[in-house]
Amino acid sequence: NDEPGNLGYDEDEEASDLPKLIANKNIENTPHAYEMIVGDQAIESFIKKITAKKEICIDTETTGIDANNVQLVGLSFSNTTHTGYYLPVANDGDGPDGAKHILEKLKPLFEDETITWIGQNLKYDFLVLKWYGIILKGKTFDTMLAHYVIEPEGRRSMDILSEQFLGYAPVSIENLIGKKG
């Protein structure tokens, strides 16, 4: 259905002056270092590592797609190629694995005005965090908005952009945490 001549083929979707890469890289054949951050000491150590650079990628993992009606289930960060940190959130409570406790520990990081926050659809992440009383300060760079500027008609999912511009096929979020909603 997605070839010229077939019903449902959208020629505009294929039309682009931007180069396309073949997504031949994936988690199986690309070196990576992913770390799960659990506990107060690990969070303090993580903050020191992540603030070594002033450009930090952030993503929130939530229970749904409506930022006004979701619970936080985790936060992911990166400041170096092929390196990532994941902070799981068990519930919305004040306990050591609860969102309020974890976000309070991360508050100095979020309030650092020297950091540039990078992400895909940052408005969503910022709104989710705002519901928990967290305001990210500093500059922002949204890959979804940047892609819109260079290719207004293109598709913008993070997986598609990763394949198109990095040649990397990411593990889908559904495979990691299950279907949202």
Per-range role (PLM):
Residues 1-13, 17-38, 66, 70-181:
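Active-site-proximal helix-loop-helix substrate-binding element of RNase H-like nuclease domains
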Residues 39-54, 107-111:
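A short acidic-Thr-Gly-centered motif at the start of a beta-strand
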Residues 51, 55-68:
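Short acidic, Gly/Ser-rich segments with clustered Asp/Glu that frequently serve as metal-coordination loops
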